[in-house]
């Protein structure tokens, strides 16, 4: 699964330059999680998970606190999750996950991006069946066999455990992501660089330089949209 790990790292690195955009997207996600339950992360597991992910992305504490305070203050915005699927050039596929307070705006924007950037938006399920929803946990380490034993003993449903560039990379069934994190914390592992649910392509394609330029423009435009939280694709050389 080295290629999958490389793609996850590349995606996270590519976003590091757009810090203000990352902060804003996490602010929305934290606010939405706090509004859907208690605004206290110790009483709201969804909120706690989002905050942990925000910290991994180096989102400042004041951004996190501001989003929670907004929820506590009775902010009246309601956010809805969505998923849009489509195609780029030469067998490339793309999934955009959204969190929006205005679904009509989001649908219009996503459709426009696909149309203007050389893609075609598809029906629900037209692409996602070629991706596996997967829990991904990453932390510093070099002994995947030992980690696998910890997870096996905790009855975590694990797809794979690998060592990549000095990191332990764990792929779990999506329902067991939090169980896996808890098992690792119980074993004394508390520092994670990634704890995410990812849509991982079952197979990948490589695009020509010309097609890659078109596809990269499509991905960048989707990621720049304020309502788009995550973008997944099956292009190996992006």
UniProtKB/Swiss-Prot annotation:
Keywords: Cytoplasm, DNA-binding, Transcription, Transcription regulation
Cytoplasm recorded as keyword: yes
Entry superkingdom: Bacteria
GO MF, any single term: DNA binding
GO biological process: regulation of DNA-templated transcription
Coarse class of the protein's main subcellular location: cytoplasm
One protein family per Pfam: Transcrip_reg
Alphabetical list of PANTHER family matching this protein: TRANSLATIONAL ACTIVATOR OF CYTOCHROME C OXIDASE 1
Protein name, per record: Probable transcriptional regulatory protein YeeN
Species: Shigella flexneri
Gene: yeeN
